[in-house]
């Protein structure tokens, strides 16, 4: 699955409804967030398991009718480097153990 790293998204991961349904993720609760345009959004939150840095992690998954997004909660403890140019590299690297949550 491809996803976009969204530095303005403070959640863990967002997935579109069809993908959540096909994965059979269990519903957990409703959530509320303020979007970049200032509007409020109410959405469903599910529970998912991801393999991140070779470890399984149980995380909340927000339902959003968009491209899958990786949020800053999942990126906590990692360094993000972006080459801002055509075909630039995006690198995600774990910080030293003492600097991880």
Identify what each model region corresponds to:
Residues 1-101:
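Pepsin/retropepsin-fold aspartyl endopeptidases
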């Amino acid at each position: 699955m491809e996803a976009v790293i969204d530095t303005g998204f403070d959640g863990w991961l967002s997935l579109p409804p069809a993908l959540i349904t096909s994965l059979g993720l269990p519903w957990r609760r409703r959530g509320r967030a303020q979007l970049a345009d200032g509007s409020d959004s109410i959405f469903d939150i599910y529970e998912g398991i991801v393999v991140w840095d070779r470890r399984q992690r149980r995380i909340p998954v927000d339902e959003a009718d968009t491209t899958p997004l990786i949020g800053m909660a999942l990126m906590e403890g990692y360094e993000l480097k972006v080459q801002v140019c055509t075909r630039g590299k995006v690198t995600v690297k774990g910080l030293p153990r003492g600097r991880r949550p």
